[in-house]
Regions:
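Mature, well-folded catalytic/scaffold domains that follow N-terminal targeting or propeptide regions
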Residues: 1-309
Length: 309
């Protein structure tokens, strides 16, 4: 009853466009890893057993399997009010090194059961909890892309910065919807309202770096297409490098992507995100998560354009 079929990530079924045969196979395999993790979470009896099974997934796609597992665990937490500790247990154990992906995976459940999510957020990491809204945005962009690229805003339930986090995830989904086709991606974002484009480019930077895989030439084209949003693109790429570095699944492609999009090797891009956490505090209007993002973006921004942090 709770299963998700392979058709859920089939590009033809989803109506996605722009992908070469290679990219379609590549991105469908990424989706397949998510489904594998999701179903493992429903089948395994303990977080330890789940963690052990997830380590059998190919290293490059293992983080996505952890993301899918997080959706499964979060769904079980929701369905069993007498036991709502699966996500927290997983984060304390086998899921610790994949904490970024797990927070994103929780958001898939929020997208499907969109109530009580603010109570859920309070149980997540105070900084990374915003990634669940990112996961919500990815889910909506992936499964309902026609209405969102036609201009539908984030759900009315979302307020304030929740809407921006949603758009960061929606931006990630555009990498899949457009099959990694740089021209289509740029065109899709340019058709969105101007106040959303910076967050969409941030999401693209993350997806292009984490999920890939395109050529060095295509990455250079992506950077040029981002134009004034190159700092946001680079910040997303740095986030991807950090997620992979913490999980121990950096690849040669990760470094290629960060070299082009950030001007840094992957390990240095990941280190930059750590440095940006120093003395990080929220203010009355801006979440600490957004201040963190801005600090990273400022590293890639000419001095005259620096944002206050």
């Amino acid at each position: 009853m709770l299963g998700l079929s392979q058709e859920a990530v089939d590009f033809q079924q989803r109506g996605f466009r722009g992908a070469s045969v290679f990219m379609r196979n590549r991105l469908e395999n990424v989706g397949g890893a998510f489904l594998a993790g999701y179903h493992l979470a429903l089948e395994c009896d303990s977080p330890e057993d789940l963690g052990s099974k997830l380590t059998e997934v190919e290293l490059e796609r293992r983080g996505v399997a952890f993301e899918g597992a997080a959706m499964g665990l979060a769904l079980l937490d929701f369905l069993t009010p007498w036991r709502r500790d699966r996500i927290s247990q997983f984060l304390r154990g086998a899921g610790d090194s994949h904490t970024y992906m797990i927070h994103v995976g929780v958001g898939w459940v929020w997208a499907r059961i969109p109530f009580g999510f603010r109570r859920w957020q309070k149980k997540l990491d105070p900084l990374l909890g915003w990634l669940a809204f990112d996961g919500w945005g990815f889910h909506e962009g992936f499964f309902h892309w026609p209405k969102y690229i036609a201009g539908q805003p984030p759900p009315k339930k979302l307020k304030g910065y929740e809407r921006r986090s949603f758009d960061q995830g929606f931006g990630r989904s555009l990498w899949f919807v457009n099959g990694g086709n740089i021209e289509l991606i740029a065109q899709t974002i340019s058709n969105c309202s101007a106040d959303r484009q910076s967050d969409l480019w941030s999401g693209i930077g993350l997806a292009a770096t984490y999920a890939g895989i395109v050529s060095e030439t295509s990455l250079g084209e992506l950077r040029e297409k981002a134009g004034e949003f190159q700092p946001q693109l680079a910040q997303g790429a740095a986030f991807a490098a950090k997620a992979r570095q913490r999980a121990g699944n950096l690849t040669d492609y990760t470094s290629l992507a960060t070299k082009i999009l950030c001007g840094l090797p992957a390990v240095d891009a990941a280190r930059l995100t750590d440095a940006a956490l120093e003395n990080l505090r929220a203010d009355s209007n801006v979440p600490a998560y957004e201040i963190w993002r801005r600090r990273i973006q400022n590293h890639f921004t000419p001095a005259r354009q620096l944002q206050k942090t």
